[in-house]
């Protein structure tokens, strides 16, 4: 496989799609050796097909705000790969949303879903709509207009969206209500992230963070380390960071930072249950800032416009958004000699940062493995919907832990390099092999 030749072709076809091209390059660099051992992949042009979405749908989303003025946003759904199951991936409502970001997320989702071993393909969607500053009525109107187009291309055996940044329980409720209205059918497995009262799964809001800490626990355990008593620096303060903070504390670690677009909070005493629940209050306020934490909990300190990676910790967990941790941040972290770094956000580290971590043989794991607990629990929600059953929190947690342990096992199997485990390589190869073999079996489609 000539990675540079493939990338040059993609750059000509998709100029300016920085995030997507970054994600593709990372995977290709990881799998090139194993790919070259399978001439049947080359003959079937698996790489050329796997890097292109099966379908992209773009549509306008008109809606009327509370002032009676017409607003127009753009909606997207990238149906990337269905080789191992219906497309599965979240919806993101944020002004930064564009085709490059959604293609990168859909591409990553394809391999992440494969790692869970559940029958789910990869997809992603969303809009450049921002929920910030919008009333409930405006959010509902937007969601209803968005679903009026989206419903034509989704369904339990076709494409199953979920939430992501800007799409929480409220938005999923409005989207599902409109889907039900348009189809006159209650297909619970059409959307995941639903409310517990109407088909949702217990632990879904916490699942990404919980799963991440289970993965980190297994990483450290495999290397003779114990998470108990260790300090954790994490970013963000939304559902993902909240779930990670809850499980880290439960496992005996001490979370010392959270962050927002305005800066970060350092709390030397660590986050207890009250402080962790306050993270949800911050998110619910809609202000997207973390500074109020300092006023609520004296003794903590707010650092305006800075990132938490400058603080010394044993474990670093980017939990906010893509490329939030860059090469300079990686240098600061490595200088602190951490035990473990794990991406909880999707592609939370830049390529430069990842290269620095792996070159230093730092214990590091990529988002497609670490944060797979979210989509895994979405898959469990689909299973419960199909069976017309509802599992207890203990049952869901047990299955989630089993799935994350299995993902870790696959990463070690494919990523072992002497005494070092290259989790980036392991995750990419494990996910790729499953999808590639399925594509090969299904012919040139």
Listing of model-derived features with the role each one plays in the protein:
Residues 263-364, 369:
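Rossmann-like adenosine-cofactor binding region
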Residues 2-23, 219, 334-445:
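Adenosine-phosphate binding glycine-rich loop
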Residues 40-69:
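Structured beta-strand/loop patches that form or line metal/cofactor-binding pockets in enzymes
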Residues 195, 200-312:
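Glycine-rich phosphate/diphosphate-binding loop of Rossmann-like nucleotide-binding domains
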Residues 59-120, 124, 128:
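Phosphate-interaction motifs
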Residues 94, 113-228:
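Glycine/serine-rich phosphate-binding loop and adjoining beta1-alpha1 elements at the start
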Residues 1, 15, 19-22, 26, ...:
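Conserved active-site and cofactor/substrate-binding residues in soluble primary-metabolism enzymes
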